[in-house]
């Protein structure tokens, strides 16, 4: 049976692991402001805004959410891990939220305790937020940097997380198929993206049934091009293009799919019409670099080794000057997360790490060429979770 979220048991194990780390570090509580970290530990997903919110995990005591009143009724609908909810009306308010947070922590018996935190300001600081640091409101408490605690826990995925990523990859292949099918001469890439997103999302919901909902995205599937059409495909982080799709274009499609808040990444370079000799050469070198990366994935290899493998292919082809980014990055709850497949990162690959593999080359005024696959590092080497065709014939749109 397919699960659509992390089990309550796994959330409880994560909390227990946090408390063991707190005890070892002689800390009395963990105070978190990062919404992704809160979701990772509790399964509670909310829209993070200028309004401060925090999760407090005491060594002994109730796991408590501090936040705006508009979240009070939302918390119990999403999780049973959070045991207490304490709220203020709104930001900035007649009394600033951080003053409320200081009072809440005093009531929890933490006013003079040692707490690990990801923000000594006491808030994530989004959307123009301003406020006195929590450390100045609770001068007798000691706040210690624990910003890497949750990211380090997230690095190696559990069996439940891997299962969610596998399911995400399955639906990404469907969405990429629709993106490719809907490309037409004179079409606006946004219209194609919306059509593919809508159809893939509808099929996904109908197939998975009433219990499925996306947990960290507005739509189950997000499929599109971000304006990476023709010459704009040479801009890796393009956001839009003023023109429509036409014959001869190189097109880069991207897909993510939310399963339990986790998402794979699938990207494919497509060519609309018969490829030119130059397009064919650039495309094939990019695929060769990708294959070199796949061969390099193995336990004990460094993240930098993957990047070096693709750089070597591009250098041999005379394309080193067309590289604009490293080979990949971690995947899971966020579109980009550690580890980085970068020449400057000598961190060792470990079984259970999931990353994107996306070497690319980009010539300004001509085109960009990049596929991205989601790769699970295993004891045997690596497993491709996304499996959409990568060859030029399959990705040529006639």
Predicted regions span which residues?
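Active-site neighborhoods and metal-handling regions in enzymes and metal-associated proteins
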Residues: 1-398
């Amino acid at each position: 049976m397919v699960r659509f979220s992390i089990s309550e048991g796994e959330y409880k194990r994560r909390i227990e692991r946090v408390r063991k780390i707190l005890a070892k570090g002689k800390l009395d509580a963990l105070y978190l402001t990062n919404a992704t970290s809160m979701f990772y530990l509790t399964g509670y997903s909310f829209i993070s805004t200028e309004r401060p919110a925090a999760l407090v995990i005491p060594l002994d005591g109730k796991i408590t959410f501090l936040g705006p009143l508009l979240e009070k009724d939302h918390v119990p609908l999403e999780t049973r891990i959070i045991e207490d909810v304490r709220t203020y009306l709104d930001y900035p308010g007649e009394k600033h939220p951080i003053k409320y947070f200081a009072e809440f922590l005093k009531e929890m018996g933490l006013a003079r305790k040692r707490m690990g935190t990801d923000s000594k300001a006491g808030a994530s600081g989004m959307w123009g937020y301003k406020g006195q640091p929590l450390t100045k409101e609770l001068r007798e408490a000691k706040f210690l940097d624990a910003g890497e605690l949750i990211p380090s826990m997230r690095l190696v995925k559990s069996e439940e997380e891997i299962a969610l990523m596998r399911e995400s990859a399955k639906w990404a292949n469907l969405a990429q198929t629709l993106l490719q099918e809907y490309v037409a001469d004179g079409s606006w890439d946004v219209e194609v993206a919306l059509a593919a997103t809508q159809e893939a999302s509808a099929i996904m919901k109908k197939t998975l049934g009433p219990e499925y909902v996306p947990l960290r995205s507005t739509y189950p599937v997000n499929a599109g091009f971000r304006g990476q059409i023709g010459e704009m495909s040479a801009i890796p982080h393009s956001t839009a293009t003023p023109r429509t799709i036409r014959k001869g274009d190189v097109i880069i499609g991207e897909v993510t799919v939310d399963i339990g808040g986790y998402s794979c990444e699938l990207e494919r370079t497509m060519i609309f019409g018969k490829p030119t000799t130059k397009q064919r050469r650039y495309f094939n070198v990019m695929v060769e670099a990708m294959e070199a990366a796949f061969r390099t994935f193995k336990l004990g290899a460094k993240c930098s080794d993957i990047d070096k493998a693709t750089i070597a292919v591009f250098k041999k082809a005379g394309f080193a000057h067309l590289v604009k980014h490293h080979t990949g990055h971690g995947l899971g709850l966020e579109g980009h997360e550690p580890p980085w497949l970068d020449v400057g990162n000598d961190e060792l690959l470990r079984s259970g790490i999931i990353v994107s593999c996306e070497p690319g080359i980009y010539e300004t005024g001509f085109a960009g060429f990049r596929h991205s696959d989601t790769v699970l590092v295993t004891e045997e080497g690596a497993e491709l979770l996304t499996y959409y065709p990568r060859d030029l014939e399959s990705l040529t749109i006639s």
